[in-house]
Amino acid sequence: MSTVNPSVAKRSAARLAAVQVLYQMEMTGADTERALQDAKDRRAAEPKGRMADPDNSLLNQVVRGVSAQLEDIDGHVGRALSGDWTVERLEAVLRAIVRAGAWELSARPQTPARVCISEWVDVAHAFYSGPEPGLVNGVLDHLAQTLRGGEMGKGA
């Protein structure tokens, strides 16, 4: 029987929570700090043990990073989408996932690209049972090839 490393579980929980916060911000117009505080308040009111507490540092970095670099992130994501797809055409939760994954690929080189992609695909699986996780995988893989080509074997 395998056990999950607590720090890995906390980072996974932070990614899931970041998507929820980014979604809340888009749906309600809440600013970054208000949305982060609301999420913290909700977690404090929840019974313990349902899932790992998120790594608050990573949660805050993702949400603040996406918020601060939204235009650049959307440019990267838009170029990674195929055909006539645009960032705006993506459903809001899916948009939050690819934005957060794109931010992590661009801003956290300490997270290996393949780990980053896998983690965000897992987040997509938490919300979707259809083709959406495949879209997340494709977009983030394209971005990883662009942003971290050497790590992904491109141009090596």
Curated annotation (Swiss-Prot):
Gene Ontology cellular-component annotations: cytosol
Pfam families, per database record: NusB (PF01029)
GO-annotated biological processes: DNA-templated transcription termination; transcription antitermination
SUPFAM superfamilies recorded: NusB-like
Molecular function GO labels: RNA binding
Record's keyword terms, sorted: RNA-binding, Transcription, Transcription antitermination, Transcription regulation
InterPro entries: NusB-like_sf, NusB_fam, NusB_RsmB_TIM44
Protein function: Involved in transcription antitermination. Required for transcription of ribosomal RNA (rRNA) genes. Binds specifically to the boxA antiterminator sequence of the ribosomal RNA (rrn) operons.
Family assignment from sequence similarity: Belongs to the NusB family.
PANTHER family noted in UniProt: ANTITERMINATION NUSB DOMAIN-CONTAINING PROTEIN (PTHR11078:SF3), N UTILIZATION SUBSTANCE PROTEIN B-RELATED (PTHR11078)
Protein's name in the database: Transcription antitermination protein NusB
Lineage: Bacteria, Pseudomonadati, Pseudomonadota, Alphaproteobacteria, Rhodospirillales
